[in-house]
Amino acid sequence: MSGRGKSGKARTKAKTRSSRAGLQFPVGRVHRFLRKGNYAKRVGGGAPVYMAAVLEYLTAEILELAGNAARDNKKSRIIPRHLQLAVRNDEELNKLLGGVTIAQGGVLPNIQAVLLPKKTAKSS
């Protein structure tokens, strides 16, 4: 009778909320952070699932673009520079992360148009 409680029925295998929602990010941990963070007195059951899904989507989006930047630079490992290039070259991500500084990210290459040499028309 091992694995059975008082009711006599076998206990089903525990299923995480992340796997129920089809997510990789930990729903339970997000729920704990929402409760401990003093954001509200009470946290609904769907809130951590939704937030974990949003975090997972944003992470996947940034990593996709950073992987493309790494491949363009002929590198197999994503470094902070690739994250910076990915975020700053994407209009929506740049707006979302406008006030964020990425350590060791560098700057985007940019030369103002007025500093470029003048185009002279050669007449021959």
UniProtKB/Swiss-Prot annotation:
PROSITE patterns cross-referenced by the UniProt entry: HISTONE_H2A
Alphabetized GO MF terms: DNA binding; protein heterodimerization activity; structural constituent of chromatin
Cellular localization per UniProt: Nucleus; Chromosome
UniProt-reported outcome of changing residue 121 to G: In P.miliaris clone H22
SMART domains noted in UniProt: H2A
Crosslink feature (Glycyl lysine isopeptide (Lys-Gly) (interchain with G-Cter in ubiquitin)) location: 119
Post-translational modification: Monoubiquitination of Lys-119 gives a specific tag for epigenetic transcriptional repression.
GO cellular component annotations of the record: nucleosome; nucleus
Anything else known: The H22 clone represent the major H2A component.
Family affiliation: Belongs to the histone H2A family.
Annotated protein name in UniProt: Histone H2A, embryonic
